[in-house]
C-alpha cells in the first residue's frame, strides 16, 4: 500500500515481543495483498480487472472496506469517493510533473468514476464494477483498517500496551507502564494529546500539492469537480478505531465547513480538530487557525472532554 509501518509495544519478555511484532507485521502483509493498488496481484487489483463482468465474491476484509467507503460517499454527498481512483492517479502525475491535467484527461477520468459504478451485495458478499476503466482507491480508508487489525493481532498475543502507526494514522492500546496514555503530538496545532484505547488520524495537503499559475492544488481530489482541492485545510480526528478515524479525517478535508458538524454527529464520541492556515505564511511554514469539534463528544458521554484544550487557537 506504499506506506511505512511502525510498532511500539511492551511485552513480558523479548521473545514475546518479537513473536507478537512478527505476527502483526505478517497480518499487515496479508492485508496489503488484499488492498494494495500498487500490486497487480492484490485482491483489489484483480477485482478491478474484472470490471464490466458478473459480481465477484470478495474477502470479508475487502467487503468491509468497500462497504464503509460507499457509506462515507453517501454521508458526504459524494465528496468522499473510493471509485475516483482514475482521478487520484491523474493528479499524482500532475503533482509529479508539475502540470495541470488537460480537459480531455479530466473528462475521461471523471467518466469512469462514480459510486453508482460499484455495486455491493451484502448477502452474497460480492462486488461488481459496472463498465470498464474504473479504478478503486482505498488509500483514504484502508490504512486505518490495517492498523486496527495489527493491534488486534498484538492483543491476541497478550500484548495490550502497543502503538501502531502507518502513514500518519495511529492506533494505541492500553497506556504504557506508568503513564496515563500515549503522548502524541499534533504538529499543526502545536499541542500534545494523551490517548489510550483510541485512534488518531490527520489528513491535509501539508506535503503533497502542486502550484500552477499561482493556484495551489492538493493531492486530495474532489471527485465532484475532478480537481485537486484548492481550499487549504488539515483535519485531525480522534475516535475509538483507526478505520473510522482514517476515513473521517479525509472526509473533513473535502466537505464544506457547514457540513462538518452534521457528519461528525453520525459518529458518536468522535472529536476533531480542523486547521486553516493563516496567510501569508511565515518562514517556518503556516500558522493555523483551529476549529475544535468536541461538543458532540461530550454530549455523547465521552470520558475525555477538552481533549484539545492545550492546542493553540
Model-derived features: where do they sit?
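Mature catalytic core of soluble alpha/beta enzymes
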Residues: 1-313
Amino acid at each position: 500500500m506504499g506506506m511505512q509501518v511502525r510498532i511500539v509495544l511492551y511485552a513480558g519478555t523479548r521473545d514475546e515481543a518479537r513473536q507478537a511484532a512478527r505476527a502483526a507485521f505478517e497480518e499487515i502483509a496479508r492485508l496489503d495483498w488484499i488492498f494494495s493498488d500498487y500490486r497487480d496481484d492484490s485482491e483489489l487489483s484483480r477485482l478491478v480487472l474484472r470490471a464490466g463482468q458478473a459480481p465477484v465474491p470478495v474477502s470479508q476484509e475487502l467487503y468491509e472496506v468497500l462497504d464503509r467507503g460507499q457509506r462515507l460517499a453517501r454521508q458526504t454527498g459524494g465528496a468522499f469517493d473510493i471509485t475516483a481512483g482514475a482521478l487520484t492517479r491523474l493528479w499524482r502525475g500532475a503533482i509529479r510533473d508539475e502540470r495541470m491535467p488537460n480537459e480531455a484527461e479530466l473528462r475521461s477520468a471523471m467518466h469512469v468514476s462514480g459510486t453508482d459504478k460499484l455495486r455491493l451485495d451484502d448477502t452474497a458478499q460480492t462486488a461488481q464494477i459496472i463498465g470498464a476503466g474504473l479504478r478503486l482507491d482505498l488509500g483514504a480508508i484502508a490504512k486505518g483498517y490495517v492498523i486496527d487489525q495489527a493491534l488486534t493481532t498484538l492483543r491476541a498475543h497478550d500484548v495490550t500496551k502497543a502503538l501502531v502507526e502507518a502513514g500518519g494514522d495511529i492506533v494505541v492500546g492500553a497506556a504504557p507502564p506508568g503513564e496515563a496514555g500515549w503522548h502524541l503530538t499534533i504538529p499543526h496545532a502545536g499541542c500534545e494529546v494523551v490517548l489510550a484505547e483510541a485512534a488518531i488520524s490527520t489528513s491535509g495537503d501539508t506535503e503533497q500539492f502542486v502550484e500552477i499559475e499561482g493556484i495551489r492544488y492538493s493531492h486530495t481530489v474532489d471527485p465532484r469537480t475532478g480537481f485537486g482541492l484548492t481550499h487549504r485545510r488539515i483535519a485531525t480526528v480522534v475516535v475509538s478505531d483507526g478505520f473510522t478515524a482514517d476515513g473521517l479525517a479525509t472526509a473533513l478535508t473535502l466537505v464544506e465547513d457547514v457540513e462538518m458538524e452534521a457528519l461528525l454527529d453520525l459518529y458518536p464520541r468522535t472529536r476533531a480538530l480542523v486547521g486553516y492556515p493563516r496567510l501569508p505564511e511565515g518562514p517556518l511554514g503556516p500558522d493555523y487557525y483551529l476549529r475544535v469539534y468536541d461538543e458532540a463528544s461530550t454530549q455523547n458521554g465521552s470520558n475525555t472532554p477538552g481533549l484539545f484544550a492545550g492546542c493553540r487557537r
